[in-house]
């Protein structure tokens, strides 16, 4: 168990972000999952009708499976090929609801900046010991949260490559 009171921030509540949160829980760390969308897997839902090219057995992280099974979750057929919607409904939503993750999930929290608190690019002495200051935008405005580490699982869905790039 880690005695650091600050959480580890995970940016994004898609498959990778929630798997990271589950792994943090397994290792005794507190996650703080910051999702820009209004639901877990928000980017996945935008292509929810598309069938994923890998079966369920390759899409469920071991630490996530452990948390889910403790809550009574029954895994889908490992050889089946889910759609994006299936992935959200049968895996991400139940994972986000487990008691080890649910209280640490913040929907509608768009991360706009990550820095070391009290430091800029020119100031380096002591930087490694400073917490991360994460600026988030919500419907209520801008705020700052602190974390001891940051995992960026925000994905690339919001950063498309233009034609010809």
Range-by-range predicted roles:
Residues 1-8, 26, 123-125, 158-165:
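Extreme N-terminal leader/targeting segments of oxidoreductases
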Residues 6-33:
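N-terminal Rossmann-like FAD-binding beta1-loop-alpha1 element of flavoenzymes
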Residues 11-14, 36, 107, 147:
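A secondary-structure boundary/capping signal
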Residues 16, 39, 157:
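Conserved Rossmann-like nucleotide-cofactor binding loop
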Residues 20, 43, 116, 161-163:
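Short glycine-/acidic-enriched loop or helix-start segments at secondary-structure transitions
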Residues 37-90:
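Glycine-rich active-site loop/strand segments that organize a redox cofactor
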Residues 74-159:
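Feature captures the FAD/FMN-dependent oxidoreductase FAD-binding
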């Amino acid at each position: 168990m880690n005695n650091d009171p600050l959480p580890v921030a995970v940016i994004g509540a898609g498959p990778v972000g929630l798997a990271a949160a589950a792994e943090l829980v397994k290792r005794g760390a507190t996650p703080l999952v910051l999702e820009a969308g209004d639901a877990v897997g928000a980017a996945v839902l935008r292509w929810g009708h598309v069938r994923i090219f890998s079966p369920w057995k390759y899409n469920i992280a071991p630490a996530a499976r452990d948390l889910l099974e403790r809550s009574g979750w029954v895994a889908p057929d490992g050889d089946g090929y889910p759609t994006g919607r299936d992935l959200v409904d049968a895996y991400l939503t139940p994972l986000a609801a487990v008691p080890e993750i649910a209280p640490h999930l913040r929907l509608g929290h768009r991360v706009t900046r990550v820095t070391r608190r009290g430091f800029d690019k020119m100031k380096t002495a002591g930087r490694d010991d400073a917490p991360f200051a994460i600026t988030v935008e919500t419907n209520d405005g801008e705020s700052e949260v602190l974390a001891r580490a940051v995992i960026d699982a925000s994905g690339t869905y919001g950063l498309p490559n233009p034609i010809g790039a």
